[in-house]
Amino acid sequence: MSSSRTDRATVAAWASWDWGSAAFNAVMVTFIYSVYLTESVGADIGGSIPASSWYGWAMAAAGVIIALVAPVQGRRADAKGRRRWSMTMWTLVVVALMASLFFIDNEPAFFWPGIVVMAVAAVAFEFAEVSYFAMLRQVSTPDTVGRVSGIGWSAGYFGGIFLLLICYVGFIAGEGGAFGLSTDDGMNVRVVALVAAAWYLLFALPTFFRVPEIEPDATVDSSYADSYRRLFGELRQLWREDPRSIKFLVAQAVFRDGLAGVFTFGAILAVTVYGLSPADVLLFGIAANVVSALGALAAGFLDDSIGPRPVILWSLGLMVVTSIALLFVDGPGWFWPLGLVLCLFVGPAQSAARSYLARIAPEGREGQMFGLYVTTGRAVSWMAPAAFAALVAIFGTDRAGIGGIALVLVAGMILFALVPKKPASPAPTPRGK
């Protein structure tokens, strides 16, 4: 049986994981559960360090673990012919951890186990995502890799939109949402954790069973130490044979951190600079996901027509122009259209970056390369927050932070422009089980 299936049903099954993963990214990390942890559970933890800082440190520790282990984790899954198995196992771990967050009551003592579980879930999620990304070449051809990547990214955004709406209407709006759950002990948000876990599991199931497993490599490393030694040796060889890959990994890490900064600080800026209410921020988040999804979907077809390089460069360039415009306007009336234009180009840049790497990854080493994709991203994940904070401190206004994000996007765009133009088409995926 071939380890590659490119029919529509398999592509849909693969993209279904992206749709389901929004339960963790959008609901747990970005909009709902992390806010509950830091603003409610951790509101009275005491001490001089706020709950948000402790949460940030916990996620930073998770990032260090991911950066150190992800490339080897992806490589070992590839070598053992267990790419799908690895993705499945780590996804189930994330689902279990998400469900366990139901038991985090709205009491200060529960804050500490809450941030630990969130950090461990973040590690497991990234490990699952490494193998999931590596499957891209199994479900696409050289002619369709761009649009398939775009379908996946847009599915993630649309999944987030639907689940956020369900959670907002059912459990958050007013006093406990349409179901009228208690808000005093955080029951409405705790139930959201269960709903999100069930959502993720349900939509991950098609990927578990439809995407085929890959063939194992005869040269499986016997230990993690062997894996690291082989990894560094292969990186040296990769630099000699195709330095473009290393240059791209560095460039994408920088511009993807700028993309992350748009969503990380967008809600803060919406309230402090442009005067949106907290309720309007959630509505803007839903709208932002809609336009990002549409952008990723459309860019996927452009990717296959003109290549990922111009898609990335045009997306980053237009984001920089829009960011500069936002520096000089005030009020919700300007923030809504310009903010949505900014988000429109986030999806295309993300999708095209993934398809670019899928095109140049050496055959049989996709998991390792996407592990490095994650690691390099984590290694520079401080750039956008640092640039934002530095300019805010220098100029004394949150508005200046927009310029910090724009600077990171410009740096990533310049680095990517220096990467050689045409990525090679991927070699045929090896035959499998």
Positions of the model-derived regions?
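Structural signature of the two symmetry-related core transmembrane helices
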Residues: W85-S100, P310-A325
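Helix-loop junctions at membrane interfaces in 12-TM secondary transporters
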Residues: F102-V116, L327-G339
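Helix-to-loop junctions at the C-terminal end of transmembrane segments
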Residues: I66-R82, G295-P308, V392
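Intracellular juxtamembrane helix-capping segments at the cytosolic ends
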Residues: F127-S140, P348-A361
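A membrane-interface helix-boundary motif in multi-pass transporters
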Residues: G46-I49, F171-A198, A390-L409
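Multi-pass alpha-helical transporter architecture, strongest
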Residues: F102, W199-R210, G403-K433
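Short amphipathic helix-loop junctions that connect adjacent transmembrane helices
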Residues: M28-S52, T264-V281
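Juxtamembrane intracellular "pre-TM" segments in multi-pass secondary transporters
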Residues: S2-A12, P212-V250
